[in-house]
Amino acid sequence: MWTVYAKELLELLRDRKTFVFTVLLPILAMPLIFGSLGYLSSFMFRNAQQAELTYAIFGKQHAPQLAERFAREKSLREVPLAQPEAIKAAIADERIKFALVIPPGFQDALGAHRQASIALHYNNAVALDITSKRVLAVIEQHNGALRAQALASFKLSRDQLDFALDPVRLEVRSTAGKRERIGALVGGFLPYILLMVCLMAAMYPAIDLGAGEKERGTLETLLLAPVPRGALVLAKFLVLFTVGLTSALLMVASMGLLLTLFGGALQGAMQQGVRAIGARDLAMVALMLVPTAAIFASILLALSIYAKSYKEAAGLISPLMMLIIVPIALAMLPGVELNWFWAMVPLTNVSLAMKELVKGTMDYRMFFAILLSTSVIAGVLLAWCRWWFEREQVLFRN
Amino acid sequence: MIEVTGLAKRFPMARQKERRAKRRDPREQQGWFQAVRDVSFECAPGEVLGLLGPNGAGKTTALRIVSTALRPDAGRAFIDGIDILAEPLQARRRIGFLSGTTGLYGRLSARENVEYFGRLHGMAPERLRRRCDALFEQLDMHEFAHKRADSLSSGMKQKCAIARTVIHEPSILILDEPTTGLDVMSAKIVLDFVASYKALRIPVILSTHHLHEVDKLCDRVCIVNHGASIFQGTVEQLRHLGGGGDLYDAFVHVIHHGA
């Protein structure tokens, strides 16, 4: 059996495609992709927050103080516009980002202690609504100044004013640590990537080991060697298992390394969250990967050995990819949390467990239950794969 | 020595196919295809047995049964007195099997390909090394022993496949259309190899469509049609059946009219 195992591994190592997929991709590409994506998004976000916004303002004479406040903002630049009717067109062709229209009587209303309003025109069909936030910040400053004046003219004390503004104030005290919040964010997609890498890395070798033997005409001679078929299956299974697991573990290791080296570069809360993920948690994530890799290896091998050619094998395996994504993606849905119900759903439970591990809120009884059930499933699948391999209809389908 | 008696093997048929091809072949019945119904033959040391028959006659299935890849529904087969059904692993150690579609592992070198099968046959490293050296010498393969199988010419590949077939010093050879699809030079390598093993007094079963190969190498012939062996005898006896000296006529006669 080990002869077969060693030979298959040697053959795979000589294949550059497999090498790239199993070793280079998880080690380099994944952290690189996520690193650059994270950097890019934070960069863009900062840019959008600080970028200069052009605006037009009408009815300045009705509220000179407010207009002046806007004029003082460094990152806002006024662009003169002929009349309010031109606002929509000006926003559409990006001459201005937003426009403010102050109605007549604005100042009078305020003077009479009545609420006054101004209109903000802008295009809010964007994912991150930064424009309104920035305008609101300026208005809020102005409101603050006006409140201070009102405080003086109403002759109210600070406490009385607070009561008048917000009789009941809600104090939010989060019980979640910083790590838990970061974990909820990161932990959602981490298992998705890990499991996909684990599956994808084993996919090409699987096709080679099963359908490839048929297509090259080596299967027949291999079956005639005095090696029990069970041993052949086990050897091939172990190769796929090794490849999938190695690939996923390499990714865990490379991410761990990346975090220890560059974790300091992350900002505030993110950094603390990342620091809190210890080697033990990563080890447990790795442990979770073991039976999962076995499940993937069994399914892939069974499909591959059934196929007559590379082409057919690839055709059989791609729908499997789609199918396996479903339970993994389920774990990312809001409201799907690890409980005894979800702990019984294969693959979803693995994803959820990884998420909990990253968050640092794992229920260890559940962890071992999931580990056990996943191992049992892997064992059953391996047994099925072995039975499948002994069927003449599968091996000699022509 | 190999003795095969009354082999039978059937395969389940796909349902649609069953309806479409109703009773075109007498071997189809109730969702089963009786690929081999009754095949018997034997081959003694120093003898080459030619297994003849039209495409789809059941030759390959019969040979796969004898080489233990498939289990028969009925019949028995003995290799040097070993029951292949009772002790398939023992039987496999004695069989060298080669077919026209046999491939090599492209990313392994010629030598690694051969050694891999030697190891699968449980050969000790020292014995394997000596055997490999001898075979590579005999087949003149040293030049390309360390080249990847991918990059070999078809003649080199054929030599490699032959070395792989006999690495474990089998006591019988089963060759399933070994020259099909080969060019003349590669085919000659195979035929020379058969002749050399005949000289070593090792029984050889050669399934083929090329009657000149039968003429050149075979001592006895077994003709299979519709899953049953319908003629067994020497090449001379077969030639006689055709009336003249021509093997083609004789073969066609046996297929149409029986022996």
Residue ranges: model-predicted function:
Chain B
Residues 19-25, 115, 119, 126-144:
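Conserved ABC ATPase "signature" region
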Residues 148-152:
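Conserved ABC ATPase signature
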Residues 169:
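Conserved catalytic motifs of ABC-family nucleotide-binding domains
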Residues 173-176:
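Catalytic Walker B motif of ABC-type/P-loop ATPase nucleotide-binding domains
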Residues 232-233:
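ABC ATPase "signature
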